[in-house]
Structures are given as C-alpha cells and as structure tokens.
Swiss-Prot record:
It comes from Aster yellows witches'-broom phytoplasma (strain AYWB). Disulfide bonds: none annotated. CDD domains: HDc, KH-I_RNaseY. SUPFAM superfamilies: Eukaryotic type KH-domain (KH-domain type I) (SSF54791), HD-domain/PDEase-like (SSF109604). The lineage of its organism: Bacteria, Bacillati, Mycoplasmatota, Mollicutes, Acholeplasmatales. GO terms for cellular component: plasma membrane. Residues 217-277 form the KH domain. This is Ribonuclease Y. Endoribonuclease that initiates mRNA decay. InterPro entries: HD/PDEase_dom, HD_domain, HDIG_dom, KH_dom, KH_dom_type_1, KH_dom_type_1_sf, Ribonuclease_Y, RNase_Y_N.
Length: 528
C-alpha cells in the first residue's frame, strides 16, 4: 500500500512537473514573441524613417538635377539658335551675292546673244553685197562687150587688142572696189573679235573673285605686362641678342604699351620669330637655351603650316596629284610678297582666271589652272637659288616632271620667250589681269625687298659664311660665320670683304653696318 501510494505521489509529481514545464515554456515563448515583436516594430519604424529621409534626399537631388538640366538645355538651345541665326544670315548673304552674279551673267549672256544676232545680220548683209557685186560684174561685162565693139569700130583694133585693153581697165577698177570692201569687212571683223574677247575676259573675271592681301613687314606680339619687356631683353641684353641672332629678325621694344614689334623683310622668318616669342611669353621662362628649343618647335609648326597651305591650294584648284616637295614649295608662296601682292593668292587668282578663259574657248581647263597655279613657283626659292624666278621656276617644274604646257607657261608669262601653246598664252593674259588692277602693286616695296635680299646674297656668297640676316631696314647686315673655317683673326677680313662687295654691287644712300659674329660651343653630357 505504501509503495503504491508512493508511486502515485511520484507519478502525480512528475505530471505536475511536466505540466509546469510546458506551461512555463508556453508562457516564455509568448513573452519572447511579445518582446521580439516590439523590437521588430521599433526597427521597422527606424528603417521606415531612414527610407523616408532617403526618398526626400533623392527627390531633392532629382529636382536639382532637373533644374541644372533645364538650365543647360536652355543654354544649348540659345547657342544653337544663335549659331543657326548666324548661319542663316550667312546663307542669305551668299544667296544674295549669287543672285546678283546670276543677274550679271544673264545680262552678259543677253548681250552676247544680241551680238551674235548682229553678226548674223552682218553675214546676211555681206552675202547680199556679194550678190550685188556679182550682178555689177555681169553688168560691167555687158558694158565691156558693148565698148569692145565700139572700140573695134572706132579704132580699127583687132579683137584681141581690144580685149586686153578692156580687161586691164576692168581688172583695175574691180580690184580697187574689192580691196576697199575687203578692208572694211576686215576692220569690222577685228572690231567684233576685240569686243568678243573683252566679253570673254569680263566673264572670266566675274566668275572668280579672290581676296587681296596687303603687304606687311612687321608683326606685333602682345605681352601681359611691361615687366615682360625686361625679361625679353634679359641681363645685359643677352636674351634679345640671342633672339635676333637665331631668328634673323629685328626686335623693337619701345614705349608702346604691352607690345613687342618684330621687323623683317622675310615673312617666314618673321612668322617663326613671332611664334617663338609668343611661346616664350606664355611659358614665362626666357633664356638662351629655352629660346633655342622654342625656335625649333616654332620652325616645325611653320613648316607644317606651309605644307597645309600648299595642300589647300592644290585642293581648291582641283588640279590632281602634285609631288609632295612641290606642294611644300607652293606653300612658301603664302609668305612671299611681290609688288604688294601675296604671291599664293595671286597664283590662285591666275589659276582660276586661266581656267575660265580656257573653258570659254574649249581648251583644257584643269591644265590651264595647273599652269596658272605654278607660273610664279620660282619666287618661293628665288632668295635661295641663283637666277630669275622664271629660270628657277622652269628648273623646279622640270625637276618634278610637270607637263610641257606648264613649263612653257612658266617660261613665257613675262614674255621672256614666245608661248608655244595656247595654255601658256592664257596664263600670261590671266597674270596680266591679276597684276594690272589699280593699286595691286607697289614698285618701291618690291625694290626695297630686292635690296635686302641682295645684301644677304652677297654675304652668303662669301667664303666661310654660314648664314646672314639683313636687319634695321637694310642699314645693317648681320653675318654668322662657321667657326671651324674662319678663325677669330680673320673675321675682320671677312667683314671688310663683304663691305667692299656691297659697295661694288649695291647703290644706296647712307651707311650699311656689317657685323660678323663667330661663336664656338663646347657641349658635354654628364651621366648620373
């Protein structure tokens, strides 16, 4: 009994224990779920708050980006509208010019048509006159027959004798009348031919209108402040001396505010010096070694520009393939001035005029343009080679195997020889048209440049001279000798030789200063 009661108590205790354990687990689970749910809600609330802040921030950024985009779009639209307006104005101007030219051409065409009608009427008149003459001849023959019979009766002449007398008188009278008529018709024909030739020239000139570039012997370089002038001059003038010696250009630094003037009769030299000085001013470092580097860079840049100008000229004229070296020589004409005309512009003008004249008379237009473009090619190298620009041009064209019509045009455009082709004659006419415009040329400037070129030629022909530059408007010639050929003791003799040669060959007023420079450099490279 006791054992059974004890087992019952134990069973009941275990049941209560497990029941209490289950109840505690359930209560603990609900408590855990309650507190965990509260934490999750707090975290969710915090996350929602952060999400709202992010959304607000994104909205602000989106609004700001929209504002910036609208501003940028408005700016671009304004620029595009302005550009469109400018282009529209340009197109309107071009259309207006084209309309005016078309009106002029139409007027000229009508005039030519009228002249053709006039010529046709003249031909009809001539034909009618010819018929009248034939009728008159027949009448004269009838009269002669009558006279012949009368003469035979009166003078008792034989028929052959009378025939000879009558024929001689008739021949003399008819010949006189015919010669008078032929002379009148020849004068009319010459007059009509002259008018038609002038009309062709006017039409050719109207179809091409080129820009005219005036001559300029100085270039101006702007500098940021007056202190830069002192840096350009350098200590004891070493920088400006180095610039003048290396470039061969005269630097003029006066009281003009924030400007430096470059003076030289050689435009290529002056352009290289200008770019060199602009590079040095922008860089800020000005000393002899830096000047040499800047000069090298500027020389390459100008060489590339010369090539571009030559390529542009051949492209504009559409003359086909040209030798690369000949293109470079052609580009140099951009910097060559002759009688106040830019020679490259002049050559382009001659090319187009010659081409138009050729097309009007049925000749090869492309070949005429090519001959016109190269007719003054010798002027690109006339300061480097001996001979006239015509002789040099013929030599260059022959070297690069140009066609015989082109060589003939170069050789005959100054009437040094008779033109052997129609193309050469057309180029000579076009050259005269381009050169003969009022104010197109100035003799005095050309003579001045020729005198400076002659000074340099005399100096360069002296033994041991490396290069020379005429500066100070031809009042000084600066000569640089080769140090390995001319010793210090002989530079005075070189200066005296050049001076005597100048006195023999050049007529001038005043004094020309001859300065001979000899410089020796020693360079070693230190390796670290």
């Amino acid at each position: 009994m006791k054992d059974a009661s004890w087992r019952d108590h134990c069973t009941m205790g275990c049941s209560l224990f497990f029941l209490a354990l289950i109840c505690g687990s359930i209560i603990g689970y609900f408590l855990y779920s309650f507190f965990n749910q509260k934490k999750l809600e707090e975290k969710k609330q915090a996350f929602d708050n952060k999400l709202k802040e992010k959304e607000k921030d994104l909205q602000k950024r989106e609004q700001e980006m929209m504002r910036n985009a609208k501003i940028e779009i408005a700016s671009l639209r304004q620029k595009l509208e302005l550009d469109l307006e400018q282009r529209t104005n340009t197109i309107v101007d071009l259309e207006s010019k084209n309309n005016r030219r078309e009106e002029l051409l139409n007027n000229r065409t009508e005039s030519l048509n009228k002249r053709e009608e006039h010529l046709d009427s003249e031909k009809q008149i001539i034909s009618h006159t010819k018929k009248n003459l034939e009728q008159q001849i027949k009448e004269q023959e009838t009269i002669l027959n009558t006279q012949k019979q009368q003469l035979e009766k009166i003078a008792s002449l034989t028929q052959d004798q009378a025939r000879q007398i009558i024929m001689k008188e008739t021949r003399d009278q008819t010949t006189y009348e015919m010669m008078s008529y032929i002379k009148q018709e020849e004068e009319k024909a010459k007059s009509e031919a002259s008018k038609k030739a002038k009309t062709l020239l006017v039409l050719a000139m109207q179809k091409y209108s080129g820009d005219i570039t005036g001559e300029k012997n100085i270039s101006v370089v702007n500098i940021p402040n007056e202190d830069m002038k002192g840096r350009i001059i350098g200590r004891q003038g070493r920088n400006i001396k180095s610039l003048e010696v290396l470039t061969g250009v005269d630097l003029i630094i006066d009281e003009s505010p924030c400007t430096v003037i470059l003076s030289s009769f050689d435009p290529i030299r002056r352009e290289i010096a200008k770019k060199t000085l602009e590079f040095l001013v922008s860089d800020g470092r000005i000393h002899p070694s830096r000047i040499e580097k800047a000069l090298e860079t500027s020389t390459i840049e100008v060489d590339n520009f010369i090539k571009e100008m030559g390529e542009e000229a051949t492209f504009i004229t559409k003359i086909g393939e040209v030798h690369p070296d000949l293109i470079k020589i052609l580009g140099k004409l951009h910097f060559r001035i002759s009688y106040s005309q830019n020679v490259l512009k002049h050559s382009l003008e001659v090319a187009f005029l010659a081409g138009k004249l050729a097309s009007e008379i049925g000749e090869n237009e492309i070949l005429a343009r090519r001959a016109g473009l190269f007719h003054d090619i010798g002027k690109a190298l006339d300061h480097e080679m001996e001979g006239s620009h015509v002789e040099i041009g013929v030599s260059i064209a022959s070297k690069y195997k140009e066609k015989k019509e082109v060589i003939d045009a170069i050789a005959s455009h100054h009437e040094d020889q008779e033109p052997q082709s129609i193309i050469a004659a057309l180029v000579a006419i076009a050259d005269t048209l381009s050169s003969a415009r009022p104010g197109a040329r100035k003799e005095s400037v050309e003579n001045y440049i020729q005198r400076l070129t002659k000074l340099e030629t005399i100096a360069n022909s002296t033994k041991g001279v490396a290069k020379s530059y005429a500066i100070q408007a031809g009042r000084e010639i600066r000569v640089i000798v080769e140090p390995d050929k001319i010793a210090d003791n002989f530079i005075f003799q070189t200066a005296r030789t050049i001076k005597e040669q100048i006195e023999k060959e050049i007529i001038y007023n005043g004094v020309i200063k001859v300065t001979v420079l000899r410089e020796t450099r020693a360079v070693e490279m230190a390796k670290l």
